[in-house]
């Protein structure tokens, strides 16, 4: 099944030994804390159906998903984002609507982050000499992300790990509550970079958010790709592990110089 789209299958056995297969959209599934299917019932009659495992999408197993219905429900950007995130091209993609919903939540969070920032005071330009430790750490993660995403997409063609890095960056921005002049400058730099880095995967949302950030209507593909600032990657401190009798007891931060 390498490189194929696969999905869960559900069925009931008929009296003659044949199987009647039900589309996953028509089945209510129960899962454990690890996301594994523990039970399933047909939505129309509430009666149990058997779990047939994960198979290549096919008419015979009735486990296909209509892409148009998913696009109509979640939008083309969300479906594309899930498809690129769920598996690298050389591996099989397991279709999971819960995963699509997760991508929709990520994009909604990103939209809220950008619009909330755009609704605040005007931002300054980042002045590296004026940044405090927290601002430097946030900016370092931004430029580490630019470096990773550029390599993942440009050299490795690994969109899934690039998207994961952008999710981590958004989580960090959500915790970065610095509303000072330089804090807002760092946030603005990060949000602009995220819009450009996500543009190959979610072009419609990226185009809209680029305008929210104050830019005129333009073709984002004509914008320069974010560049890594080598100075932003430099760490002022190093984390050292403290071990006693071979067991980790804590960590300490020490100046690099």
Name the predicted role of every residue range.
Residues 1-185:
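Long, charged, mostly alpha-helical binding arms that flank functional sites
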